[in-house]
Amino acid sequence: MAKAKFERNKPHVNVGTIGHVDHGKTTLTAAIATVAAKTFGGEAKDYAAIDSAPEEKARGITINTSHIEYDTADRHYAHVDCPGHADYVKNMITGAAQMDGAILVVSATDGPMPQTREHILLSRQVGVPYIMVFMNKCDMVDDEELLELVEMEVRELLSDYDFPGDDTPIIKGSALEALNGKDGKYGEPAVIELLNTLDTYIPEPERDIDKPFLMPIEDVFSISGRGTVVTGRVESGIVKVGDEIEIVGIRDTQKTTCTGVEMFRKLLDEGRAGENCGVLLRGTKREDVQRGQVLAKPGSITPHTKFDAEVYVLSKEEGGRHTPFLNGYRPQFYFRTTDVTGAISLQEGTEMVMPGDNVEMSVELIHPIAMDKGLRFAIREGGRTVGAGVVANVKD
């Protein structure tokens, strides 16, 4: 059978289901796949296939995640669903499955529960830009007022974490009815409304190529008669010959100009997001640049030593520490291409952090690193990964 060609004619958007255990995330995921296939074409996935989430590794951490794809009239969606709460925490912190928007599933019979709050907080910390809500199991609630009460609670909770609670779309339905092909208001029509809302409420994400140029430096070479070449994979944007660029991180920021781009020993006029290339720098000495710095569009990113982070600490079974760590712990923080030592301050009331925990912390590095909110990092001790984190907030 010929392999189906991947059609790039529709915008691609990454989404996922979040919410408390047993509120119906996986049933909704199956219902979305089924209804989308029926309405817009494509193949349906059944509940069992989604629930038996395969293990994957991201930054040395084992995560169970299900990935499904579906189409709407205007877009192609990649959708992640995790079986367990710990998998969500790991997934969101490592960025294994980045989300352009999330569907928060809340059971109408329970209302918001502890993990509902925790997933909203995590979304805020790791930079999930949009959340919309599917109020599930509405077929099991007879009282209209109860539904309104749950809706109010959810809106308040979203507002508590700086999401626009009052303006968030909340769709009432029953994932099970939709999955079973029922066409009452809580069945298939509710899921079709959800799909239409995904299309309208979650904006098309900015593609990497349209963002400002950034390339983490992996290696530095000196080529006699030509100058200094740095190599790396372009993370975002485009660099063209003649562009002014900055070298950011570890030392004071320096300005330079790109005088050449090469890939596989061929000279090019530009390097684009996703490409591995060498960039020739005008007037820059080999000893002025090092691995761990980044090349960037001037003014687009700044170096910082202090930041707040959301961190997942590996369990002993995952190869992490066997013992807790305390305030003032000084591991290495691995950003992009290099390790930098930093000291950890825990939040008031947190004495220590156990392997397997997720925790908010403040960090002070010994060298500045080019960073923005949302940058992922690993925490290492003597070369082994003991944690994964994301910058939640840059200080100075």
Curated annotation (Swiss-Prot):
It is found in: Cytoplasm. Keywords: Cytoplasm, Elongation factor, GTP-binding, Hydrolase, Magnesium, Metal-binding, Nucleotide-binding, Protein biosynthesis. Belongs to the TRAFAC class translation factor GTPase superfamily. Classic translation factor GTPase family. EF-Tu/EF-1A subfamily. Residues 174-176 are annotated as: G5. Residues 136-139 are annotated as: G4. This is Elongation factor Tu 2. GTP hydrolase that promotes the GTP-dependent binding of aminoacyl-tRNA to the A-site of ribosomes during protein biosynthesis. Monomer. It catalyses: GTP + H2O = GDP + phosphate + H(+). Residues 19-26 are annotated as: G1. It holds the Pfam family GTP_EFTU_D2. Mg(2+) binds at T26. Gene3D superfamilies: P-loop containing nucleotide triphosphate hydrolases, Translation factors. GO terms for molecular function: GTP binding; GTPase activity; guanosine tetraphosphate binding; translation elongation factor activity. Residues 60-64 are annotated as: G2. One of its GO terms (cellular component) is cytosol. Residues 81-84 are annotated as: G3. Residues 10-206 form the tr-type G domain. It comes from the Bacteria. GTP binds at residues 19-26, 81-85, 136-139. Its main location: cytoplasm. CDD domains: EF_Tu, EFTU_II, EFTU_III. InterPro entries: EF-Tu_GTP-bd (IPR041709), EF-Tu_GTPase (IPR050055), EFTu-like_2 (IPR004161), EFTU_2 (IPR033720), G_TR_CS (IPR031157), P-loop_NTPase (IPR027417), Small_GTP-bd (IPR005225), T_Tr_GTP-bd_dom (IPR000795).
